[in-house]
Amino acid sequence: MGKHKDSKRENVLIAAEEVFMKKGLKGARTVEIAQKAGVTHAVLHYWFNTKEELFKVILQRKMMEFRESVLVAFDQAEGPIEKRIEKAVGAHFDFIRSHPGLPRFVVNEVCGNPDTIEPVKEAMASEISDKISNLDIPNAATILSDILSLNLSAFLVAPVIATLGFCSEDEYLDRRRQENIDTILLKLKNSSL
């Protein structure tokens, strides 16, 4: 019985992630999430009292996945700082690519509902700040900001590039991944001169 309950709860989380990624907090409806998950609306609200509570769980999961993908890649990479940053930039890009709705979701929620991400932001900011302060590179916070903006913007622009017929989204993203790594490494090299 416990495993069945756990799998149903996980189905709710999967459905909620899909709906929140497409519609954001304000546009999402718990009735739709319950239907997608194959549970009653009452069961959904038994597990998660409010839509905001469910949203926070999804947001925390996505941020933890993000954290794991980037910080673990950075920590596990061996060698000089350039090699470690190259791995972290690539891991961040790959993480976003495997979660295609995430860039738009992040931009919409950060701009439209900044209060909803505040608790998660504070927890991650302190860990990232600790990681940055341990790096022996000038302007580490700026470089981190550049990594985030370059990688996120690539996924926001990719559909436009494909629609205009310049190349497919996949071709564009394959090229941008390496260009973003090269750009960050060049900036790192120039900041250490």
Describe the residue ranges of each PLM region.
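Helix-turn-helix
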Residues: N11, A15, V19-E53, V57
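Amphipathic alpha-helical packing segments from all-alpha helical-bundle domains
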Residues: M64-L71, C111-T142, D174-Q178, D182
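N-terminal intrinsically disordered/low-complexity leader segments
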Residues: M1-S7, L193
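Short secondary-structure transition hinges
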Residues: E53, D94-D130, F166-E171
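Hydrophobic alpha-helical connector segments
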Residues: V57, V72-S98, I137-I147
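C-terminal peripheral helix-coil segments that are non-catalytic and often amphipathic
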Residues: D94, S126-I137, L150-L193
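Short alpha-helical scaffolding segments that buttress acidic/His motifs in well-ordered protein cores
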Residues: V89-H92, V106-E109, I147, N151, ...
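Short, basic, alpha-helical segments at the C-terminal edge of helix-turn-helix-like DNA-binding modules
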Residues: T30, Q60-F66
